[in-house]
Amino acid sequence: MESRVLLRATANVVGIPKLRRPIGAIHRQFSTASSSSFSVKPIGGIGEGANLISGRQLRPILLLDSSAINGGEKREILKPVKAAAAEGGDTAGDAKVGFLAKYPWLVTGFFFFMWYFLNVIFNILNKKIYNYFPYPYFVSVIHLFVGVVYCLISWSVGLPKRAPIDSNLLKVLIPVAVCHALGHVTSNVSFAAVAVSFTHTIKALEPFFNAAASQFIMGQSIPITLWLSLAPVVLGVAMASLTELSFNWLGFISAMISNISFTYRSIFSKKAMTDMDSTNVYAYISIIALFVCIPPAIIVEGPKLLNHGFADAIAKVGMTKFISDLFWVGMFYHLYNQLATNTLERVAPLTHAVGNVLKRVFVIGFSIVIFGNKISTQTGIGTGIAIAGVAMYSIIKAKIEEEKRQGKKA
């Protein structure tokens, strides 16, 4: 900006011949020049925007009239002007590209890493809590409560700015939040009842329920290729369930209810499409889901917690560790869900779908290593087949969605 203003300031001085006199002559001639030999010329008007730098007006300066100074003197005067213009061009004209802007794949890779890392840590810490505090309804409330407090603090400092909500948007978000709450609680009931790896194997069936709901409830036509890709998922889950050493019906049925709940959440989410950003939408859903989860937690687990639940947990690990575990598991739960949303915004649906499958592989693998869960050969093979089927389904579905978008653009 400064270079453009300075160059414009010199526009009134024209016809620069070769240098004939030394610069000292300028001062002698200027001191003897009559008052008519020079005039005051402001550099452009405010309306033209020529005198504004960073919102401040430049003070008018005295420019010697062409009759008062010969060509050589003009050239000497213009030297510092040109030098300043060149210096300004070097600093303001050539904006350096930031490191992160130059290598966006590093940022995306960091998002994927943090998404996986937080998800694995959440699942491990969550299961450790259930080993000494088997109250999934209460823990589910803590997950949402910590996330809601985090959102409220973020809103208070304007990161992000809270988006206003009206009664119409609230009506469409309530069904989404109810399904989110039900799916979250039943997932935790399953995590508490069986091995983490088995729960995630059962939850691999979620795409099957999504396809079934789209076909038979929403009336959407599902290509045969998608149905065929789901066959290995069903087969793999069946194989893993038959020989799972930690199998029990509470864990199995709870994971299946979670799949159905999250399927309906997806259906209601499509009906609740809004211009609000995903961070604010997730915050409002978390707040509503928290109020949905509190009553059943009080009814189902309240008396047990007051009688001996809290006391037993504190006796086993101590008050400080008990409270810190609940706080951090809630933070990890909220942050990994937020990172999943942020990652989806940075990559194509196909990349995110593959990443989601790999995330489940990471969680299953790490849970087996950390907790030393013994699995049979058939369970391992069944889990592998189910994950491969989910990968096939995710890739095919993402390609179909991309073709639809390209068709709409054309």
Curated annotation (Swiss-Prot):
A Pfam family matched in the record: TPT
Protein name: Triose phosphate/phosphate translocator TPT, chloroplastic
UniProt GO cellular component terms: chloroplast membrane
Transit peptide residue numbers: 1-82
Induction pattern: Expressed with a circadian rhythm showing an increase during the day and a decrease at night under long day conditions.
GO MF entries: phosphoglycerate transmembrane transporter activity; triose-phosphate transmembrane transporter activity
Tissue specificity as recorded in UniProt: Expressed in shoots, leaves and flowers.
One of the GO BP terms on file: phosphoglycerate transmembrane transport
Membrane-spanning intervals of the chain: 105-125, 138-158, 172-192, 222-242, 244-264, 281-301, 313-333, 361-381
Source domain of life: Eukaryota
Presence of the UniProt keyword Protease in the record: no
Gene for this chain: TPT
Family membership noted in the UniProt record: Belongs to the TPT transporter family. TPT (TC 2.A.7.9) subfamily.
Compartment(s) of residence: Plastid, Chloroplast membrane
Physiological role: Triose phosphate/phosphate translocator that transports inorganic phosphate, 3-phosphoglycerate (3-PGA) and triose phosphate. Functions in the export of photoassimilates from chloroplasts during the day. In the light, triose phosphates are exported from the chloroplast stroma in counter exchange with inorganic phosphate (Pi), generated during sucrose biosynthesis in the cytosol. Involved in photosynthetic acclimation, a light response resulting in increased tolerance to high-intensity light.
Keywords: Acetylation, Chloroplast, Membrane, Plastid, Sugar transport, Transit peptide, Transmembrane, Transmembrane helix, Transport
Xref: InterPro entries: Sugar_P_trans_dom, Tpt_PEP_transl, TPT_transporter
Disruption phenotype: No visible phenotype under normal growth condition, but strong reduction of triose phosphate export from the chloroplast and reduced photosynthetic acclimation.
Modification sites for N-acetylalanine: 83
Membrane topology: Multi-pass membrane protein
